[in-house]
Amino acid sequence: MKKYLAEMVGTFVLTFLGCGAAVSLNCGVDTASVVGTAMAFGISVIAMAYTIGGISGCHINPAITLGVFLSGRMNGKDAGMYMVFQTIGAIIAAAVLSLLVWTDPSLVEGTATGANACASNNVFNGLLAEVLLTFLFVFVVLGATSKTNGATNNFAGLAIGLSLILIHLVGIHYTGTS
């Protein structure tokens, strides 16, 4: 149960801080907003990797859990439970953010609670960006945490968090990076 709760808390932190930064920056597509949002997501992953990584592996994302499962590093029961607890953590974070937004009118301006300027992109571009960027992120996570590639796992959290920053820098323009 401890590893499932760690995933819930880690996903809460990632969602609350990453999406909280996006909301605080009014989900803007200006350079400062994009960089700030990307940094918030990446640094959240780095912090959680070193906080809960030893407990659960710090997947904090169902796509990562699916990749770990498909690579044979995790059984189906744990993968399913991770995804359930990750979803619960994300829902709690979204609820807390909603409460904060609705009690602070300055955050309910422009597009802070809905589609941003990225909404003008077509579905194909968005789907292509999401699939490719998710693949790249899972690829980095699996490589950085592999025991057979000679990588120093002490730095896996840093490599993963920095790659998430890069993924957001690219993906925010297309979809807002889910």
What annotation goes with each model-predicted range?
Residues 1-178:
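Membrane-interface helix-loop junctions and terminal tails of multi-pass membrane proteins
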